[in-house]
């Protein structure tokens, strides 16, 4: 099982990947939205923002998200690490319910290029 430290490092790598992206991916990552990532197996949530093409983790809390972020992710720590490492396809994991993504309709349309 991935640790909280490994998951935080995975989010940092994802942020770095988004910042280095171009084209549609860069456009989708350029949103300015609140973000939460609930790691179900660790019962831990990272909260922060997707802003300026980067993920900024502002807090780590025990349990589910304390407030409803504009973009909400739900998965296990192992799945987060596997997705960032390229070992798990996000679109397939989302379609199967293995990974949860909730956001407003317009944000989902923009975020689809990240899938």
Give the positions of each predicted feature.
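Feature captures hydrophobic
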Residues: 1-115
């Amino acid at each position: 099982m991935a640790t909280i430290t490994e998951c935080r490092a995975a989010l940092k790598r994802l942020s770095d990947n988004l910042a280095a992206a171009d084209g549609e991916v860069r456009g989708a990552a350029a949103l300015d939205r609140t973000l939460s990532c609930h790691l179900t197996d660790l019962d831990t949530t990272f909260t922060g923002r997707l802003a300026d093409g980067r993920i900024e983790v502002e807090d780590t809390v025990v349990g589910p998200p304390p407030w409803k972020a504009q973009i909400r992710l739900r998965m296990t720590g192992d799945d987060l690490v596997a997705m960032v490492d390229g070992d798990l396809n996000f679109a397939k994991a989302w379609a199967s319910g293995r990974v949860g993504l909730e956001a407003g309709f317009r944000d989902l349309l923009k975020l689809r290029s990240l899938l």
